[in-house]
């Protein structure tokens, strides 16, 4: 990695650490959202650097849908234990009672009940006034126009017309009772930055990001890795072993894999350099309705 690139990554690192420390100093009860993906791994690594040699002054929160990959759950528990982090796990009890299923109820309803409502329940339950998230501006168009400090009203809704200026890295965290801020320390990072930083810092990631032969079903143009037996095959469908990896991770029925032979971090980085598609092209929730992500964020989604 050349010196110019290394300096760029260190600048991003310094900015993110500054934001994390600013939030810890400014807010009474912050929390770090932990979705187990590569961005969460980088954000957690930066937070540990920000307060080293001390422990994190806030807990991790995972809003569980019950449909994550098994390797993600194993990685989550192992990571929290290894770093001595307080891990809070919340699953929407109403969604569980209703038996919400992405295959039966569809991605939009599944996401709304198990993710959006589940997140709002958790934030209300613990009274968090600031929540870190690993979203980046290069991921998706609605995230591209969102500030680092994303103001949410007492119903956790986001109004893109009601955003605060952030001139010269000055952030306005003043809120009224019941309101909160979502904070995105990785806003200015790109997918390539993330992978190069993971390589530079030797950050552990979920093995699903690396190519391997996995059981895959092709449905509606998406390569779905079959992670358990909660699926009914349609006529003519067949599960076949294919060399795939994931660029983004979520609920396994709603997250498409990509065909790839990249089995190491340098190979992933090389793949990123020639990629012309978004990493979220395989996320069903981003295209289940017009303006999908912005609509979800207006309703309280991250």
UniProtKB/Swiss-Prot annotation:
Q: Which InterPro entries match?
A: PAPS_reduct_dom, Rossmann-like_a/b/a_fold, SO4_adenylTrfase_ssu, Sulfate_adenylyltrnsfr_sub2
Q: Can you tell me which residues the record assigns to a coiled coil?
A: none
* Taxonomic placement: Bacteria, Pseudomonadati, Pseudomonadota, Gammaproteobacteria, Enterobacterales
**Record's subunit section:** Heterodimer composed of CysD, the smaller subunit, and CysN.
Q: What is the designated name of this protein?
A: Sulfate adenylyltransferase subunit 2
SUPFAM superfamilies given for it? Adenine nucleotide alpha hydrolases-like (SSF52402)
Native organism is Cronobacter sakazakii (strain ATCC BAA-894)
Q: Which UniProt keywords apply?
A: ATP-binding, Nucleotide-binding, Nucleotidyltransferase, Transferase
This protein's pathway reads: Sulfur metabolism; hydrogen sulfide biosynthesis; sulfite from sulfate: step 1/3
By sequence similarity, the record places it as follows:
Belongs to the PAPS reductase family. CysD subfamily.
- What function does this protein fulfil? With CysN forms the ATP sulfurylase (ATPS) that catalyzes the adenylation of sulfate producing adenosine 5'-phosphosulfate (APS) and diphosphate, the first enzymatic step in sulfur assimilation pathway. APS synthesis involves the formation of a high-energy phosphoric-sulfuric acid anhydride bond driven by GTP hydrolysis by CysN coupled to ATP hydrolysis by CysD.
State its Enzyme Commission number(s).
2.7.7.4
User: Which molecular function terms from Gene Ontology are attached?
Assistant: ATP binding; sulfate adenylyltransferase (ATP) activity
Decide whether keyword Chloroplast is in the record: no
Domain of life of the organism encoding this protein? Bacteria
Catalytic reaction annotation? sulfate + ATP + H(+) = adenosine 5'-phosphosulfate + diphosphate
Name a single GO biological process.
Answer: sulfate assimilation
